[in-house]
Amino acid sequence: MLASTLLAIGLAWPTSASGLLPCQESSAPYCPPRSASPEEQRGILGEFIQAFYKDRNGTKALLNHVAEDYIQHNPDILSGRQNSLDVLGPFLSPNNVNYTIMNKGLDNSIAYIHYRMDLVGGGQPSAVVDVFRFDGTCIVEHWDVAQQRPANATNPIAMF
């Protein structure tokens, strides 16, 4: 379950970033923060999702989008960008996990992603929601919740 929890600290994105506006001109790195409109934040979030989950380039995504003093609310990882880099590196591989996005959004500088996470070769899938707080152009805070689907779930559509 630790692997599931560690994987849940980021966003998941197996397909295109449709629904989030692309930035017209990338000006990464986005930290330290600069002011940004909601549309710009959506574009920056789309770039983060593309780099971190589709391209599986956690180093690029975190260095370009996450503040050095990033506040991490996951109980298994300390705050700070470098701690996330150190912990997530081994897990960002299609050989370890598959993601399916169920829902996503961004409003008032808060972004969320609800996704299905399947560990390769391992048991029941988990439902995960990641929540990120932006300060302008920069991701500065993260929360997540994860729940593994019970093997004998009564409701076949529960969680997804």
Regions found by a protein language model. Name each.
Residues 1-19:
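Fungal secretory targeting signals
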Residues 13-160:
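C-terminal and inter-domain tail/linker signature
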